[in-house]
Amino acid sequence: MAQPFDLGKPNRTIRVGVILMGGRTEALDVAPVDMIHSITKGFVDELPAEWLPMNIRSQAIEAEFLWVSEAGKCSTSKLTSAMSIVTTHSFDDCPPLDVVMIGAHNFSYQPTEKELAFVRKSWESCSAFLAICGGIEVAVLAGIVGSKTATAPRFALESLRQRVPEATWVNKRWERDGKLWTSGTLLNGLDATSAFIQETWGKGEGSLVDYTMKLCAWPIRDGEYGDVSWSF
């Protein structure tokens, strides 16, 4: 049996894939993928030499980014705010993904069985699966949540507790259970992705991740919503 791919000590280029459903995907849900890009050689190598010491620069990872839909290469997938993105791969020609990110689709869209089958296939092969905001709905429909601990948009938690009672649903900005990472609504995906990156590629003084968090002003917020007074 093949050993799981070690994202923290990769021996090849990491494949980061955003899986897009056929409806409209929330742009802010999938935007956090760019946080991963900010610690790659492709990004770091373009920074001015005086900005980044060589010992930190050398920590950058090699990664390629794949945008995957059922229709595939050269087709466009819709995002919110009248945006669209040209996908790079179809379900048929996409290589196994190491990191998967899925955001919410519009409420009126129902994922196809082919879409859900590809999500399940990607779940089996990946080392990390990030369901951002309503992307948890795709994970639920694909049957990969099971009895895991997960979070979701706060307004959806009670409904999910009723629909998927075998799972443990927590009221948090983000949650991790093994390779499944889930987040609250929209911008909580930034918190989830930040936590994933810190856990996977290191943190603390002298690390590229710590430097990038400061350079790019990544949010640092209470994971249990302790910094806000409102609730659902």
Where are the regions a protein language model picked out?
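A short beta-strand/loop micro-motif in the catalytic core of glycosyltransferases
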Residues: F129-L130, A150
